[in-house]
């Protein structure tokens, strides 16, 4: 699933490709793509026609396009087109005459008749919805915490909240109400960089260790963002269809059985929450008590 760096790459592409443009037509090719828009596909499309895209924003793994209020004297805050990429979602800005992708789910045409926006999703776990009055922050994601690269993220509050949890470190990092945008890849990479085991009980972590972990996650995510994100199977691509290159820089994730670049020990792969965790047994010693 795309995590913060990948979603931010897409957000930047949307900012370049669709902000300032007015929606002329919306085609819904697969109802599951708009299942979160409870009023239905026809209402979804009608809600967007004539709307101008004012902003492209993100919180954690969610994206939204803030729309300009369309009626004089109407609400001061516009609606939002809220999206989540799920496991395989892509938002592509492509020439209008380019062939349709096999898994095209929603098409957006604009009044300038330039490049169109397409939502493509092979596994259909992603989705789009229009949120009334949600241009600043859509209500369905208001409970999600700021992400570690956000200017309003509070490191001290994070450290205190982390240490009050009664869970394992990686479970805490995946909790989007504590810190958003971190998924399996960057949790493993951040924990390796901070030399902390994923099952370490959060209540045993010192303030200094919590801040070190946060700094490690930020550093890894910043590097991933600079590389265009991580692409394993080409399901994640930018709005231009370009894969990320950070896979080449991963230290532990997906490298079970290989040598740790820091100490040459063999990287472990453990089952974790119906997925996998990768760690170095020497650099990240397993605590006696785990969660």
UniProtKB/Swiss-Prot annotation:
Keyword Cytoplasm: no
Residues holding DNA: 103, 123, 165
UniProt zinc finger (FPG-type) residues: 251-285
Binding note for cofactor: Binds 1 zinc ion per subunit.
InterPro entries noted in UniProt: DNA_glyclase/AP_lyase_DNA-bd (IPR015886), Formamido-pyr_DNA_Glyclase (IPR020629), FPG_cat (IPR012319), MutM-like_N-ter (IPR035937), Ribosomal_uS13-like_H2TH (IPR010979), Znf_DNA_glyclase/AP_lyase (IPR000214)
NCBIfam families named in the record: fpg, PRK01103.1
Quaternary structure annotation from Swiss-Prot or TrEMBL: Monomer.
Family membership: Belongs to the FPG family.
Name of the featured protein: Formamidopyrimidine-DNA glycosylase
Organism in which the protein naturally occurs: Parafrankia sp. (strain EAN1pec)
